[in-house]
Amino acid sequence: MKTIFSGIQPSGTLTLGNYLGAIQQFVELQNDYNCYFCIVDEHAITVPQDRLELRKNIKSLAALYIASGIDPDSSTLFIQSEVPEHTQLGWMLQSISYVGELERMTQYKDKSQGQEAISSALLTYPSLMAADILLYNTDVVPVGDDQKQHLELARNLAQRFNNRFNDIFTVPEVRIPKVGARIMSLQEPTKKMSKSDTNQKGFISMLDEPKRIEKKIKSAVTDSEGIVKFDKENKPGVSNLLTIYSSCTGESIADLEKKYDGKGYGDFKQGVANAVIDTLRPIQEKYEQLIQSDELDAILDQGRDKASFSAGKTIKKAKKAMGLGRK
């Protein structure tokens, strides 16, 4: 069985876009792959964080993943900072990373632009990301297009280490998922839905209550045509709502177009709101149970132990290959 690794930053509540675009696919992937889902809290501190908020976000993210269907018995869900081999290997890989290639990373350029004081961790972030992946002999990494450059570096570092020292690491395959809906902002439907959107009406949080979801969908940008039809170029708002509706219910977009033929946007938006509320309700109920119980800590302890066992074996081989320690 091939291994998949996915890292998730604990930076606030996940959106409906995260769920329909990625988590749903992860739930399906765990049946066919050995999956590691890592809450990358050490990556989060490359920018300033409030410690209490960070702790809260870590637990909230873990609870949402489990509530969404990630099975802690068939997958490994854990917190990065609880497995010290990540930073150990991150440092070892920094020793074979070149400053020039790290400075070329688009995300580093974007995040450091206009900043007077830039954290060195922001520069070396990709070396730690490579360590996250290589520790588990990962075969496949499903990532968005924005992370492809970092993944190419992880591949290069694996090959560089293997050539220079010993053939330790599996060179991972980068997979940009073709499945999974790309959900756009409700207010600017040409932009991806994001939790960092300054306009709160632009995104639906996975923990939004039903009335709030309904209000956001009813205020979603459409057009003046009044026809429910999928046309991404000319009707981005309506097309986005159709994608959301279809992803939540499993009904095809063609069937939904027929269903709302001759009906206005009011009826259509109500249908979308109901579909989203029905999709998120069981997840929210499970989340509330988990966040209040000791079960979540037990699951994260189990995940830490499983991850540590695999990571420990890899780091031992890597240290030996580099000549670190006594034996």
UniProtKB/Swiss-Prot annotation:
InterPro entries (UniProt xref): aa-tRNA-synth_I_CS, aa-tRNA-synth_Ic, Rossmann-like_a/b/a_fold, Trp-tRNA-ligase, Trp-tRNA-ligase_bac-type, Trp-tRNA_synthetase
GO cellular component, one term: cytosol
Keyword Glycosyltransferase listed: no
This enzyme's EC code(s): 6.1.1.2
Positions that bind ATP: Q9, P10, S11, G17, N18, G144, D145, D146, I183, K192, M193, S194, K195, S196
Disulfide bridges in this chain: none
UniProt motif ('KMSKS' region) ranges: 192-196
Record keywords: Aminoacyl-tRNA synthetase, ATP-binding, Cytoplasm, Ligase, Nucleotide-binding, Protein biosynthesis
Pfam families with a match to the protein in the record: tRNA-synt_1b (PF00579)
Any GO BP: tryptophanyl-tRNA aminoacylation
Subcellular location: Cytoplasm
Annotated positions binding L-tryptophan: D132
Motif 'HIGH' region positions after renumbering to this chain: 10-18
Reactions catalysed according to its record: tRNA(Trp) + L-tryptophan + ATP = L-tryptophyl-tRNA(Trp) + AMP + diphosphate + H(+)
Superkingdom to which the source organism belongs: Bacteria
One of the record's GO molecular function terms: ATP binding
Main location: cytoplasm
Summary of subunit composition and partner proteins: Homodimer.
Matches recorded under NCBIfam families: trpS (TIGR00233)
Record-stated family: Belongs to the class-I aminoacyl-tRNA synthetase family.
Function field: Catalyzes the attachment of tryptophan to tRNA(Trp).
Protein name: Tryptophan--tRNA ligase
